[in-house]
Amino acid sequence: MCKLMLFSLLFASALLAQDPGEKIRVIAFGAHPDDCDIRAGGTAALFARMGHHVKFVAVTNGDAGHQSEGGGALAKRRRAEAIESGRRLGVTYEVLDNHDGELLPTMTVREQIIRRIRQWNADVVLAPRPNDYHPDHRYTGVLVQDAAYMVVVPNICPDTPPLRKNPVFLYFEDDFQRPNPFRPDVAVDIDSVFMNKIRALDAHVSQVYEWLPWVDGLLDQVPKDPAERLNWLASRPEQPMGTALRQSLEKWYGPAKGAQVKHTEAFEVCEYGRQPGNDDIRKLFPMLGK
């Protein structure tokens, strides 16, 4: 192994060797104000419960995501919903003012993302994979990928100090198979905070009780009573847990506990950014089993 490669590996390992008392800083990017909550709300609640710092960023303002509302009024409503969801989870929530349905991987938006990662001094960055049915989701994945190296380059966005360590970038779980299926490198047991996640999603009234049921033809099934709505949301069918996801749970929590988990959130390590080993992942995701 050449000296330069050895030095790089030792340097990366040293940067990940965090003091047990040091707080982990996580930033998650979703295309719309509810995407982070859907894909990582439970994991965020666990981080927050342990005293770590989490920020959700919606890259668009959601001003197109409704069947009967739109524009500035809808964007204002969705921003308020996001802030309330963040309050319920114990995380910071920011909504960027880019139009819903019009997101492109431009330099302007890339710089917005680079600055947020730097300002948060992130250890972990979460985002969608760049293959998805929605162009905003795809381009959010591309934009975060494009920021993965640039966050340490001083001459890019020089108004914001560069990071001295590259974060670990991970993808949210999805069900898309092409060009390649999602790989659950990290699987988090969220059973203990499942209702925290549901209550956070409940804050996104315009989405979980109006827009998404309308899209799915289920609007007439949504209860009117707030308590019944919460129960309806919690009882919505989830995707069956596949073999790879169950194996990942058993890897991180042991066979006995891993076999019992009902609700989970999973993440795939991005090939860009820092490449963590198993010990590094346990440091960065301290809720995993020992």
Name every feature range the model reports, one short phrase each.
Residues 42, 131, 175, 273:
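Flexible, active-site-proximal loop/turn residues at the rims of small-molecule/cofactor binding pockets
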Residues 8-17:
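Hydrophobic h-region of N-terminal signal peptides that target proteins for export
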Residues 55, 92-174, 182:
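Internal alpha/beta domain cores that form substrate/cofactor-binding pockets in large enzymes
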Residues 66-69, 180-184:
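Short acidic, glycine/proline-rich loop/turn micro-motifs
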Residues 18-120, 142, 150:
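Active-site rim/loop-helix segments in enzyme catalytic domains that contact anionic ligands
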Residues 1-8:
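Sec-dependent signal peptide recognition
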Residues 61-62, 174-176:
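Short "lid" loop at the C-terminus of a central beta-strand within the Rossmann-like core
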Residues 22, 153-158, 163-165, 176-180, ...:
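C-terminal accessory domains and tails appended to enzymatic cores
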